[in-house]
Amino acid sequence: MESEEMLAGGLTEPRPATPEIQEIANKVKPQLEEKTNKTYEKFEAIIYRSQVVAGTNYYIKVHVGGNNYVHIRVFQSLPHQEDPLKLIGYQVDKTKDDELTGF
């Protein structure tokens, strides 16, 4: 399966969030709060999937307290472009058991 994970355009299997993924989520948290007009006291990345495009899309399931989760899609440009991380999309009102899919 390793070789399949490197195919451009394909989503990886869900993986446990790493400190790097938490850092990515933290960096786009203000963008999400602005778009949803909410403040998230808790913002813990749980799992993620990635997709290699002209950069990388990260799909991250974030626990925001209680039984509430959000799914966020973050785009990270190629390293030489030095663009900031960008929140591309989000899905609110998710649960722990909702599948993290491409959106």
Swiss-Prot record:
Gene3D superfamilies: 3.10.450.10
Major place of residence: cytoplasm
Any matching Pfam family: Cystatin
A GO-annotated cellular component: cytosol
Sites marked Reactive site: G9
Parts of the chain that traverse the membrane: none
Disulfide bonds, paired cysteine numbers: none
GO molecular function, one term: cysteine-type endopeptidase inhibitor activity
Family: Belongs to the cystatin family.
This protein's name: Leukocyte cysteine proteinase inhibitor 1
Function as written in the Swiss-Prot or TrEMBL entry: Potent inhibitor of cathepsins L and S, and papain.
Location of this chain's protein in the cell: Cytoplasm
Keywords: Cytoplasm, Protease inhibitor, Thiol protease inhibitor
Species, as recorded: Sus scrofa
